[in-house]
Amino acid sequence: MAKPQKQVKFKTELTISSTGSGWHFLIVEKEIVAKFQFEDKFKRVVCSINGGEAFQCALLPWGELFYIIVNKKKRDEVGVVAGDVVDVVLVKDESKYGLPMPEEFEEVLTQDTEGDKLFHALGKGKQRSILYLLSRPKDIDLRIHQALVVVDHLKENEGKIIDKVLYEELKRPMF
């Protein structure tokens, strides 16, 4: 059996969904995905398009193929539109969470052992959703506030995330 590859380069077309949703994605053939020899159902990679800044993402199954969603910000950064053939470099994502851990949240978890246990008891996908949510604000005070809100939410809801409730809690004023 061949060794799993750490990096794969290929060309593919940036495709727009035919449903009218506006979603743009890269189609990845199953033969390319097979080169990574993923061991679990989660297929996380770091993707670079046309030599642009790399981003962490999932290879999402779609019949016999896989796809990677490419949002407008990333399309604009590399100057591509639907129909463009692009150079793609995929590297197997071997990071702990599949997204960077915001520094502020890491510090909150370090200081709050109960919050740390509750966060790490969540499924990998829920952890990534929280990390993505907490990495969005540019303001450091808001990132700290939101990290504290998330930990409080976990404690108040027996380690569960109740999406609608959490989103409302995140809107409350800091002071």
What are these regions (language model features)?
Residues 1-3, 81, 85, 89, ...:
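Mature exported/compartmentalized surface modules and terminal targeting/interaction regions
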Residues 14, 43, 70, 74, ...:
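Functionally constrained cores in energy, signaling, and assembly domains
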Residues 74-76, 137:
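Short, surface-exposed beta-strand-loop junctions and turns on beta-sheet-rich folds
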Residues 2-67, 72, 79:
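A positional/architectural concept
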